[in-house]
Structure formats: C-alpha cells, structure tokens
Amino acid sequence: MSKKYPITVSSWTLGDQCTFEERVKAAKEAGFEGIGLRAETYVDALNEGLFDADILAILEKYDMKVTEVEYIVQWAEDHRSYEQKYKEQMCFHMCELFGVNHINCGLMENYSVAHTAQKLKELCHRAGKYT
C-alpha cells in the first residue's frame, strides 16, 4: 500500500447494490489500495449480518483497508435531527474501528462565516480524539 496516499475507491463508485465483500473484492481487483465507506454502507454491512470482526476479516482477506469515512452533513444546523446525530456518531465509531483519522463533511447550507466557524468548532469538539 502506498504509505502516504493510498489509492482509494470512493464509496459512491460501487453504489449500494453490492455486499460488503463484493465491494472490497471489486476494489482490490481494480487495483485500489483502500475503500471509502459511507455510514450508510457500513450499516448495510451490519444489516447483511456482519459484525465489526467480520468486516475487519473481509478487509484482511483481500489485504484492503478503509481509508476514508464519510459523510457528515447538516452539522451547522441549530437543531440537528436524531438521524444526523446518530450518523455522526457512527462515523466516529468507524474512524476508531478502521484507524481513519479524518471524516469527509459537507456543508450545503449557506450560513455566515461566524456561524459556520462556531459550528465547525462544535463539530471538532464532538469529534474529540478523532481529530
């Protein structure tokens, strides 16, 4: 694996119509060194009946790593939905599980710089040891 910048296939590349193992195998066969994983794709793997240990075993079987976790949105909202709060925590768990030190986040809303800066500070505080 490239030490500094592993070649990573985006989680979106294979969509959501394949199993976790099919995703990892396809990425390996295509020459990628790592996969990006969305919180939704991780939950899909759990819904397949996989546990964290199973997911890690599949990654090891194909000599692959999760190198990117995504995607936190609506983090600057004053009143975030339960689903967004849970997804954020899921992303934090995934970072710990896979040893990933960053999360892709998006901001689709239009806020003032001051509001955005404050909400980013709060997000970083929630991320705690993952930052």
Protein language model regions, located:
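Short active-site-adjacent helix-start/loop capping segments
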Residues: V43-L46, W75-H79
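Glycine-rich, proline-tolerant flexible connector loops at the mouths of alpha/beta enzymes
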Residues: G36-E60, L107-Y111
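Short polar catalytic/cofactor-binding loops
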Residues: S11-Q17
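Hydrophobic faces of well-ordered beta-strands that scaffold small-molecule active sites
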Residues: Y5-S11, I35-L37, V66-Y71, I103-C105
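Active-site acidic/histidine proton-transfer and metal-coordination neighborhood
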Residues: C18-E21, K25, I58-K61, K65, ...
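A short, Lys/Arg-enriched amphipathic alpha-helix followed by its capping loop at the start of a domain
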Residues: S2-K4, A26-F32
